[in-house]
Regions:
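Glycine-rich, mobile lid/loop segments that gate access to catalytic sites or pores
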Residues: 6, 66, 73-77, 81-256, ...
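Conserved phosphate/anionic-ligand binding catalytic regions in large, soluble enzymes, centered on
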Residues: 8-10, 14-19, 115-130, 255-280, ...
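Short glycine-rich or small-residue beta-strand-to-loop segments that form or flank ligand, phosphate
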Residues: 4-11, 49-57, 92, 122, ...
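Short, charge-patterned binding micro-sites
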Residues: 40-58, 326-330
Length: 429
């Protein structure tokens, strides 16, 4: 018997993602001028208001308000009619210094033995159903949102689009976990009130709302989806069919949105950020945290390990868990689940022991392996932290306190497949 599985994504204009992007933009600014900075920055946004809170230990000052406003404007909140825009919103900052107690637990004379910034468990996952070893449901949901944002920013078609949006993709799987077809695609997008009623009656308003909805649904099917499909390989493209159930703005009108429609908070989209409900999640959010926080760095490391293991052919699917105690450098446990899809004559426990022997899993070693002290985090804060393109980009940082810095930054280092040959040798593949 087949089954259905769904994953969702949200746009960069979703209130929670606005918060994530502000937190990570501030983190990047600190790391650009002070790579050793320790940060835990939380952002809250609502109608006309942003609150930036958290703990920082750094030798440098940065202009929090300027960076926050720039980030909001870049997302697309630039009009007063949105009831939230980067130029006029109020910004309250409440940043204070990191606790000495936490700093003592993390800092060591020997940097290699830097302790974990907190206790907790972190998971990494990979599956071979897409080219980037991600669940196809989440990969498509992200691509729909990213493509919709590109259409909005180009401003040539679907010119009524506003920044807030969500998507959800449901795929039918066979009993053995192979994707068969796309069953349902949900797209909810904020929009201008672009068709006005002919008079003040309720009937005229209903007629105008229905006309807007019909236009948006037609554009999603005839403009957005073809652009999404044009970016796909044959394997995923084959999942599209003539019987997909398209649910576009199912509640009807979606004019009020963004932080005016819902409050946003850093760290509230952790399943969107990771694997769309597949694998597992330890509960720790990423954005605003420097890599001494294993919530972030160890989650990236487990993804790196799982992806390279699946790419090497150890298993068709793999979940890796690391768990840490605050102040301790080495993980207290390493766990592997291959879901019965392993191609090596080993138990999952034996595979875990090989991983522990192959990879240095101390926090400072993870930072070095994945080059996590770079200002590389704003790009992670929308459309997923996993399954993204590893590339080197030029970034420019300006500050009224410091000289302008131009840097080459390597993004999504945990997506590299540079351990495949080593893993094949280790496992005799």
């Amino acid at each position: 018997m087949s089954y259905l599985f769904s994953s969702e994504s949200v746009s960069e204009g979703h209130p929670d993602k606005v918060a994530d992007q502000i937190s990570d933009a501030l983190l990047d600014q600190f790391l650009a001028y002070d790579p050793a900075a320790h940060c835990a920055i939380e952002t809250f946004n609502t109608t006309g208001q942003v609150v930036i809170m958290g703990e920082v230990r750094s030798s440098q000052y940065i202009d929090l308000q300027t960076i926050a406003r720039k980030t909001i404007n870049k997302i697309g909140y630039t009009k007063s009619e949105y009831q939230f825009d980067g130029n006029s919103c109020g910004i309250l900052t409440a940043i204070h210094e990191q606790s000495d107690d936490i700093n003592r637990g993390v800092s060591r004379e020997d940097d290699d033995n830097q302790g974990a910034g907190d206790q907790g468990m972190m998971f990494g996952y990979a599956v071979n159903e897409t080219e980037n070893y991600m669940p196809v449901t989440l990969d498509l949901a992200h691509l729909i949102m990213y493509t919709l944002a590109q259409i909005r920013k180009e401003g040539k078609v679907m010119t009524y689009l506003r920044p807030d949006a969500k998507s959800q993709v449901t795929v039918e799987y066979s009993d053995d976990g192979v994707p068969q077809r796309i069953d349902t695609i949900v797209v909810s997008t904020q929009h201008d009130d672009f068709i006005q009623p002919k008079d003040g009656s309720d009937e005229a308003q209903k007629e105008a709302d229905e006309a807007m909805l019909a236009k948006i649904k037609a554009d999603v099917i005839n403009i957005l989806i073809p652009r999404v499909k044009a970016q796909l390989g044959d394997k995923v493209l084959a999942l599209f069919n003539d019987h997909i159930n398209y649910l576009v703005n199912p509640t009807g009108k979606f004019v009020i949105g963004g932080p005016h429609g819902d409050t946003g908070l850093t760290g509230r989209k952790i399943i969107v950020d990771t694997y769309g409900g597949r694998g597992a999640h330890g509960g720790g959010a990423f954005s605003g945290k420097d890599p001494s926080k294993v919530d972030r760095s160890a989650a990236y490391m487990t993804r790196y390990i799982a992806k390279n293991m699946v790419a090497a052919g150890v298993s068709d699917e793999m979940l890796v868990q690391l768990a840490y105690a605050i102040g301790e450098a080495k993980p207290v446990s390493v766990y592997v689940n291959t879901y019965g899809k392993s191609h090596v004559n080993m138990s999952d426990g034996e595979i875990a022991r090989h991983i522990e022997a192959m990879f240095d899993l101390r926090p400072r070693a993870i930072e070095r392996q994945l080059k996590l002290r770079q200002p590389m985090y704003l790009e992670t804060a929308a459309y997923g932290h996993m399954g993204r393109k590893n590339e080197v980009v030029e970034k420019t940082f300006t500050s009224r306190y410091h000289e302008t810095k131009r840097m080459r930054v390597e993004l999504f280092t945990w997506e590299k497949l540079d351990q495949v040959d080593r893993i094949k040798k280790e496992f005799g593949l």
